[in-house]
Amino acid sequence: MSGTFLHCVVLLIALWPLLGLGQEPAFEDSMAERTRACSHCHGKEGRAGPDGYYPRLAGKPAAYLYNQLLNFREGRRHYSLMTGLLEPLTDSYLMEMAQYFAGLNLPYPPPVPTVATTPAQLARGQTLVMQGDPQKKIPACTDCHGKRLTGTLPHVPGLLGLPRDYLNAQLGGWQTGQRRAHGPDCMAAISARLDRADVSAVSHWLAAQKVPADSRPQAPGPANQATIQPDATRCGSAPAPVTSTFAAGSSPAPTDLAARGAYLARVGNCLGCHTTTGGAHYAGGRGIETPFGTVFTSNLTADRDSGIGAWSSQDFWQAMHEGRSKDQRLLYPAFPYPSFTHLSRADSDALFAFLKTIPAVKQANQPHTLRWPYRTQAALAVWRALYFTPGAETPGTDLTDAARRGAYLVNGLGHCGTCHTPRNALGASRPSLELQGAMMTMQRWYAPSLRAKREGGVGDWSVEEVSRWLQTGVSARGIATGPMAQVVLHSTQYLTDDDRLAMATYLRASQWPIARPEAGAGTTDRGEPGRQAGADLYEAWCKSCHGAQGQGVAGAYPALVGNRTVTMPNPNNLIQTILWGGYTPATAQHPRPFGMPPFVLNLNDQQLATLSTYLRSAWRNQAAPVTELDVRQAREKP
């Protein structure tokens, strides 16, 4: 008996790897895995979401999908979940995603039976789709979308297999201007000629049609020149992706003043604030919300009327160093001149030389919308008298040359303290708490302390680890998400190796005694009744990526064990990440990141609090529970 039992045990051990018992599915590095943030809403393999709101992606022309990804990222189409997911991604990665979904040739489900319609309405819809209406100058849909209505290469999508509600929403979006495209925006012009009855007729008829067996887009055919533009197949299409002309980590020649300035503009991430979503680079107009109202960034292009084309290098130095415009107006510190005042005159002149090379864009500067008395120059003068002194910073004499260079970058053009240093009631930085963490102004993200080990401190990191994180946004110790992903994407990845190492050296040397004590770790298990509920939520929503023990997948999905975003005293970043998902930045050294889907539509406040509390107490994590109030406040705009 014992011999038989022993043989069974030996056999079971031998077969265990083959049986796969107790093992998690093997991780597959594929585009299907990299686009899980997409399929979460658009269905497995992009077959379409279950509610009719998220359309099918599979099999659509790649150029069309690419255009739509750009439109969402750049504000021509409006859906905050999509915009947030796509902001850290490059054009080339968006094209790769589009090509992946375009290559999926999957069967369509049968059409949903049409309700609340009449034969006359369906006949009108068929006429508009197949023949158009010459009197209204409405071309037939088939002229562009193909005789089979399955789309036309390279840019025109198919119209079949789409829910009626989705078709109505898109036509309505074009009519109201909520949906736009690159010019020529043919659909906006055509949709404007459709009345409500025509929109309903078209959507009813299209939604009732069966998708043909060959659902692939067809090659382009001759367009009806009497009703549509000659370049109809290019309507709304964007140029192909191009590579940045300024390579990440390249070091400009010190004698090339404008090239040096272009590098410094990357260090300061000037583009990030002085460009609106989808707007011309450096043309300004981006609104920066503050507790006192909204400040709009200025036009930095070479236009003489609305930009800085008529400025001198002395005018620019005055703005950077003293916070005064060319006309002597005092500037609002939403423009971080309290940090830029540390910039050297040579670097200011180089930055100005670069800005003068930017093509002129005539775009008037938008007036600020600040409340009284904050909108007055007198109030600003009082603020400056209290909190601003122009002048270069004097780093500690005990710092190495590398650390001194790092201090110049971190506290000057890099203006890290703008987010990471707490502010007082009047919006001034509190020097005694420099870089010790703060809620970002008018946002629900928390900029962690760069000194506290429990938050964003790097005292136990090597300088190489810090430099690599600034270059890629990815580390075994954590990833860049939220606003920091934008900083890595547009700024720190472009720094030279020497400058990143200098910043790392200074940040490691900045683990000075902290004026406020670090918050306690909380508890691992207080016996909350919701612990099992949290484990169930983790099983349902998180385990497939982050693993049964929160171990994650190196290079793809971060470990949750010991993750500071999970365990830091302020839980806001954890809550925001679960709510909105996101990608790590697509950098030159990490160009194809993996993403996390948003769960804002899947989890209510109680569920999200329960899940967050579980993450903060499971495995070896120790942090205080998250309450429903924490989640509710994180969902709301300040």
Regions found by a protein language model. Give the residues of each.
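Bacterial N-terminal signal peptides
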Residues: 7-17
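Sec/Tat signal peptide C-region and signal peptidase I cleavage site
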Residues: 18-22
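Flexible coil segments in periplasmic/lumen-exposed cytochrome c-class electron-transfer proteins
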Residues: 23-35, 44-47, 80-150, 172-257, ...
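N-terminal Sec/ER secretory leader and immediately downstream segment
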Residues: 28-59, 64, 68-71, 78, ...
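Acidic/histidine-rich, surface-exposed loop or edge segments in extracytoplasmic proteins
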Residues: 51, 295-302, 445-450
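Extracellular/lumenal glycan-associated surfaces
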Residues: 59-62, 68, 161-163, 170, ...
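Extended, polar beta-sheet/loop recognition surfaces of beta-rich domains
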Residues: 463, 561-606
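C-terminal structural cap/anchor segments
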Residues: 533-576
